[in-house]
């Protein structure tokens, strides 16, 4: 996993990966948001919903701990060794929105991550053990949790949506958009 030496470096990497990820949705029509393609595990809407789910959970964990609540990770009723149901809850919660709305919501959530990073001290961000919700057997510092819920999936899921787009040629996507 990538190491970061400053808040600025982390925020710049999130922004770079997010912008590339988000741009992939420019040529996907609303009529195709739920279109399944063989060999790609998520529809465009599910792809965005997954990102929205994890980024918002990350922000929720922090907000709850700061407010004095005991945080149950990954989410109440879900376990780390069985995340399929959690993913389905993301698809249900965010899949009701259009691609445009999902993209806007993700942009808002990513902006909240930037603001949050700015509020953290270097110790809170880069030293393990500063947040109960981040204190697992792995003893990761908060920045690693931010990385695995932003940079890593923006990178990996960009590849998945690119594959989806290769299997649904642009001419077909444009033609369907006009209909």
UniProtKB/Swiss-Prot annotation:
GO terms for biological process: mitotic recombination; replication-born double-strand break repair via sister chromatid exchange. The keyword Cytoplasm applies. Coiled coil: none annotated. Keywords: Cytoplasm, Nucleus. It is found in: Cytoplasm; Nucleus. One of its GO terms (cellular component) is cytoplasm. Present with 172 molecules/cell in log phase SD medium. PANTHER family: CLBS_DFSB FAMILY FOUR-HELIX BUNDLE PROTEIN, PTHR40658. This is Uncharacterized protein IRC4. It comes from Saccharomyces cerevisiae (strain ATCC 204508 / S288c) (Baker's yeast).
